[in-house]
Amino acid sequence: RFNRVALSIADDDERSIAEYLADEKFGSRFGDDYLLPMASAIWSTGTDSIASFPIRSLVTFFDNHGLLSLGNRPQWKSVEAGSQRYVNAIAAQLHRYHLAAPVESITRSEQAVILKAHGERYLFDEVVIATHSDQALRMLTDPSKHEQKILGSILYEENEAVLHTDASLMPRSRKAWASWNYHIADNTTNKATLTYNMNILQQHQSPEHLLVTLNASDQIDPARVLKVRKYHHPVFN
């Protein structure tokens, strides 16, 4: 029913996902076991928080990505060898680049933009900051009030990603294994908890499935952990 009626939502509908589901009398199982986990996985946000996300924005995203139809789904393609392939291609075109060189500060003057990293000062005509907004704000030594308001208005939350080979994080039935596998039971953290199957997503041919699990490290066998990384995603409030 949701797939059938979702596109009839008006462009000026300002209801949240939770308000829409209640108003349109969708059952709790539909919201708790499908729509909220799906949105939570897409935006890496806990189900409690994502319930406040605008229903209009969700429907637009679902429509653009072919998620409102069970048939005629789009055929997704990916770059062979993953992002490393195009990162290396871009790097090959660059004159100079610095790796593992965190920017300490960016100061604007009438003559140049002064960038400081590793204690060294670099002068540029212009600097493009391609980071999260809170990181950009911390770099600027003299942010304007407008920059402080815009860059400081977005909150971020930490998500822990673990690369591992512990198949116990996947569904019991092998037939139910998908590229994205959401963990619903016992999720009291209000964080997105799911496991990505990288063998499906990136066509890996490894003997054991390479899995990436968000925010459930306590459920993973430590002996099967390969890498732990922490990411920060915007809070959709």
Per-region residue spans from a language model:
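Active-site/ligand-binding neighborhood in enzyme catalytic cores
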Residues: 2-107
